[in-house]
Amino acid sequence: MARTKQSARKSHGGKAPTKQLATKAARKSAPTTGGVKKPHRFRPGTVALREIRKYQKSTELLNRKLPFQRLVREIAQDFKTDLRFQSHAVLALQEAAEAYLVGLFEDTNLCAIHAKRVTIMPKDVQLARRIRAERA
């Protein structure tokens, strides 16, 4: 490259523009030290719809077995102490309880949709139970 003659310029009290360009270039070319990649986030509702499809396909129990068994034993103790349960009896109770809850949530969802909402609320559960004549 050929050298060119530089003419004198009057300073206006600011920083030299060459320094600014140098720092910008340094920032662009320098590797980012905090290069932690953000985890991928799905749009709201996508994961919920995927879970709905997953659980509608499956037939396994949704509640854990041991916590449900402890709950059954705790409730049964109010009526009679030293009761014993066959494992199949607890499983039958759990199947019935989950079937009841799934049906209740289906009716609750219909009540929310009827109210032009997509979010279920306690008043939807109360209405569904009232229509079923479970609670007057």
Swiss-Prot record:
Keywords: Acetylation, Chromosome, DNA-binding, Methylation, Nucleosome core, Nucleus, Phosphoprotein. It is found in: Nucleus; Chromosome. The modification N6-methyllysine is found at K5, K10, K19, K24, K28, K37. Gene3D superfamilies: Histone, subunit A. GO terms for cellular component: nucleosome; nucleus. Residues 1-13 have a biased composition (Basic residues). CDD domains: HFD_H3. The modification N6,N6,N6-trimethyllysine is found at K5, K10, K28, K37. Residues 1-43 are annotated as: Disordered. Pfam families: Histone. One of its GO terms (molecular function) is structural constituent of chromatin. The keyword Acetylation applies. Belongs to the histone H3 family. The nucleosome is a histone octamer containing two molecules each of H2A, H2B, H3 and H4 assembled in one H3-H4 heterotetramer and two H2A-H2B heterodimers. The octamer wraps approximately 147 bp of DNA. Core component of nucleosome. Nucleosomes wrap and compact DNA into chromatin, limiting DNA accessibility to the cellular machineries which require DNA as a template. Histones thereby play a central role in transcription regulation, DNA repair, DNA replication and chromosomal stability. DNA accessibility is regulated via a complex set of post-translational modifications of histones, also called histone code, and nucleosome remodeling. This is Histone H3-like 1. It comes from Arabidopsis thaliana (Mouse-ear cress).
